[in-house]
Structures are given as structure tokens and as C-alpha cells.
Amino acid sequence: MTRIPVEGLVFDVDVAGPEDGEPVLLLHGFPHNRLSWSEVSPVLHPAGLRTIAPDQRGYSPDARPAETGAYALRELAGDALGILSALDIESAHVVGHDWGAVVGWYLAARTPERVRSLTAVAFPHLDAYRYALRVDPEQREHSGYIEALGAESAAADFLADGAARLEAWYRQPGAGVLSEEQIQRYLRTHTAPGTLRAALRWYGAGTLLSDEPLGPVTVPTTYVWSERDPAVGAFASEQTAHHVTGDYRSVRLAGVSHWQPQQFPETVAAEILRRVGHG
């Protein structure tokens, strides 16, 4: 693990693979951390790819601003760019899952010169998602959890009774692919003082429910999504094609829930390799 300073914060980052390999930035979601890529990265390294997997803002112990506004999307994207710059990387293939995909879409739309390609997993283009919230009752039902997770009391609720609700989140139907070792690893991380409260500030910042348009993505893009995802419906995922003007591939997984990197790491890795031209 490498510690990388960016604008007064310090991020815990796993950097692995050949030093001269094409860089692949791996951005995790909630409620995980950089270890969510632990079964994906080893598949990428033999193809000559160098992986950079940070614990993002709120997850790295020394990157936890107290103000909810510090978790705005532009700040999260700035962290990712700062980590790349600290490693002397001008541009990288970006891969994101869940919230990591949200950051990835933002990077691809706003700083395409830094993004060689995008592989977004489990979260559609933000404009497609927000449109679905307006017109698709199913998506509104899927997204009912967002405001609750952004509430000031959310962390305490998750951690009450020995973190029963947090543990139930990892054991929810469809997420049972997580091994007992993985569940305990995430529980140890997110029950540490300050971790969960900081991670939930991503929701408190209001990014997902904002009306600010993101704009089209021009870089080569693959979107991997699941028909049994409890957070994102098919309508939002299918609308994503209308917001990518670069080469685009949509990959729909059957019988999979929301945590694809853990459920099917080899499938996710294969789509990354295909997108970056090594598959």
C-alpha cells in the first residue's frame, strides 16, 4: 500500500502490475474500499496493465474532511486526478463501480484528456439516471434509499446494535456472493471510528439528486450493468447509450446483483481488457 498526498489529504492506494504498463485507475463504491478490486486486478496485470486502486475521500483515514460540501463530485474527481498526477500519469483507463462509476462518468465528461477509456460498472451516466428518476416509477422506487443514507443519523443507525444494519447490508439477498472473510473485512473497516460517517457524506452532498447536467461522454466507454440490480433499473441503464458519443458497449449481466466486481470478477476484468484493447 502506498500513501499519496493530494491537496492536503493523504490517500491509501494499492499500485500493482508492471511499472511501465498502461495505467488503469480503479474506483470503488459504497460500502466498500480499494479491496473490492482485489480479485479483478490480478487478472489485469498479466495483460501488461498497471492498476491504481485508492481508498477514496472519506475512506482513507487521512482524507476525511468534516464538511459535507467537501464531498461534492468535483472534489471527488479532483482527488482521482491528483492521485494520477502524483504518480506522473497524464491519462489513464478509468474503471469505476457504484459511486466509483459516478466519479468515472464525471471524469470522462469533464476531463476527457485525462481518460483513455471508461468502464463503468453498476451505475449509468448521471444524466440518464436523473432522467429516469423523473419519468420511471421503478427507478424512483429503487432510489428511495438515497435520502436516508444522506441523513445525519445514517451512520449511527448502521452502527447500532453491533453494526447489525451494516452487516445486513452485506448479507442482503443477491449479495450473498460475498465470502465470510470479505464480509468481516468490510465490517472491520467500516466500523472503525469515523469511517462510515465520512463515507456517507457522499450521499449527504446530494450529487445523485442534483439537476446539474453532466453532458455527453466522448471517450470509448463500456457500461456493465445487471438486470437484478436493486439500485438501478433497466430504463436508466438503457438510456445511457444516448449520452455517450464515443465508441460504446453495453453489457447486461443476467442473474447478478449490484456487486459485480465481487460476484463476477473475471467477467468484469474481461470487459476491462476488451475496452482497453487487451481482450
Regions found by a protein language model. Name each.
Residues 15-63:
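Conserved HGGG/HGGXW glycine-rich cap/lid loop of the alpha/beta-hydrolase fold
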Residues 5, 17-19, 215-217:
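Short, flexible hinge/linker loops that cap or flank conserved catalytic cores
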Residues 3, 51-53, 223, 250:
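Conserved beta-strand scaffold positions in the cores of enzyme catalytic domains, especially
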Residues 278-279:
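Alpha/beta-hydrolase-fold serine-hydrolase catalytic core, especially in secreted/extracellular enzymes
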Residues 1-10:
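N-terminal cap/lid segment of alpha/beta-hydrolase-fold proteins
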